[in-house]
Amino acid sequence: MAILAQTTSNMERRNFLKKGLAAGTASLFSRQLLARETDASLQAADNKPFRLNYAFHDGMFKNSAGEDFIEQIKFAHSMGFRSIEDNGMMGRPIEQQKKIGDTLAKLGMNMGVFVVTSDSWHWKTSLTSGKQEWLDRMIKDCKEAVEVAKRCNAKWITVVPGNFERTLSLDYQTANVIKALRMASAILEPHGLVMVLEALSDNPDLFLRHSDQTNMICKAVNSPSCKFLFDMYHMQRNEGDIINNLNKTWDEIGYLQIGDNPGRKEPTTGEMNYKNIFKHIYTKGYKGILGMEHGNAKPGKEGEIALINAYRESDSFII
C-alpha cells in the first residue's frame, strides 16, 4: 500500500509539473503573440500620416527610440507623426537647434511651438504690471526668439503674460498686457512669426485663464502675429464646453494643444471625447498643428505603443 501511495503521489506531481509547464509555455506564447501583433499593428500604420497634424515632444518616445531627440523624431515620423513641439527650444545649444531644424526639413516635418522666455518671467507678475523692466525682457526674448525660429524652422511661439498684479484692477492689467503684446507683435510680424497666447489652469495666480478673455485680447492687439493657443486640457479644467468655445474663438485660434482630463495624459484616458473633438476640428478645415502637451498614461515602451494606438483610435473619426 505504501509503494502504491508513493507511486500515485509521484504521478500526481509529474502531472502537476506538466500542467504548470504547459500553462507557462502557453502564457509565454500568448505574450510573444501579443507583442508580435502589437508590432504588426504599428507596422501596418507605418509612415501613414494621421488626418490631423499631431506634434509630440522630447521624451515621449524615449523607450522606443532612445534618449536622443533626433532619433525620437525619426521614430515618430515612422509612426505617422509629422510635427514636434519643444517648449525648451530657446534653452538648447545653437547647434542642436539647427540639427533639429535640419532633421525636420529632411523628413518633411513641421516645428510647433516653443516658449518665449529666458528667465521664466511668464510664471511671475510681469506683463500685467506695466513695468518697463518686464517689457524690456519680453522685447529682448522676442528678438532672440526670431533667431531661434530661423534655426529650427518654427512659426509659432508661446507667450504667457504672467501672474495677476494684485495692486491693479483687472482692466488696467489687461491694458498693460495688450500694450506689451502689440510691442511683441511689431517685432515678430515682419518675420511671419505668430505669438500664441496660452490660457492656463495651473494655479489661480495666472492672469490669462479663459477663452473669452484670450479672444478679447487677441482682438484688441489686432495683429496676425498675436493669436490664441487653445489648450483643450486647460480649457476643460477652467470652463469646459470645448466645442462651443472652439467655435466662438475660431477666428483667433492659431494653435491647438491636447491633453485628457483628469490626469493630463493621451486621449481615451479621461473624460474628454477627443474622437468627436478631432472630428469637429477636422470638419472646420483646421490645417494647423495640435500639440501633444501631455504625459504618457503608462510607463515604458508599452505605454508609448498605447499612446500611439490611442491617437490612431481618436483620429479614426467618420465624416
Model region roles, listed by residue range:
Residues 2-63, 67-77, 153, 208-230, ...:
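Histidine-acidic metal/acid-base catalytic patches
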Residues 87-105, 161-165:
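Glycine-rich, proline-tolerant flexible connector loops at the mouths of alpha/beta enzymes
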Residues 20-32, 46-48, 107, 127-227:
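Active-site acidic/histidine proton-transfer and metal-coordination neighborhood
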Residues 46-59, 117-127, 161-164:
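N-terminal small/glycine-rich loop or linker at the start of catalytic domains
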